[in-house]
């Protein structure tokens, strides 16, 4: 069976390096399913889960956004923040979401609304990833 080499890299370290038969990610224009031999592609990566499937395993990661580069036999994901989904902290994600919502509703002129909206989107995507993992267990 044909495989594709996958690398997931955060700003601090390489989170995953291995082979897969399929990779699923949320691109800036929607969901992507990448198989070996995929057409070359470079696109933005939206905050959310990245699933790496192989015959013997499926592993899920959370990426806060970034870029995904696809070549026929290589997928490289570059993300500011990336972590294994099983290490996500639900309580921290809920707290971050609540704080971002509070910041967005605050009428203070010192609030960076674009930053607060991005933090809200990331926290919501993190919670959605946690819920998907629970649902599939």
Regions found by a protein language model. Name each.
Residues 83-137:
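Acidic/glycine-rich phosphate/pyrophosphate-binding loops and surrounding catalytic core
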Residues 1-5:
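N-terminal export/targeting signal detector
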Residues 7-99:
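Compact, glycine-rich, soluble single-domain proteins
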């Amino acid at each position: 069976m044909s495989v594709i080499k996958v690398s997931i890299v955060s700003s601090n370290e390489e989170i995953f390096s291995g082979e897969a038969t399929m990779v699923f990610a949320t691109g800036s224009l929607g969901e992507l399913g990448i198989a070996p031999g995929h057409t070359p592609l470079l696109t933005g990566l939206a905050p959310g889960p990245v699933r790496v499937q192989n015959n013997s395993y499926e592993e899920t990661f959370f990426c806060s956004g970034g870029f995904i580069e696809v070549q026929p036999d290589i997928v490289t994901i570059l993300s500011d923040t990336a972590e294994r989904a099983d290490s996500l902290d639900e309580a921290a994600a809920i707290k971050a979401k609540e704080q971002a919502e509070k910041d967005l509703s605050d009428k203070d002129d010192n609030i960076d609304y674009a930053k607060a909206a991005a933090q809200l989107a990331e926290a919501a995507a993190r919670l959605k990833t946690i819920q998907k993992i629970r649902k599939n267990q």
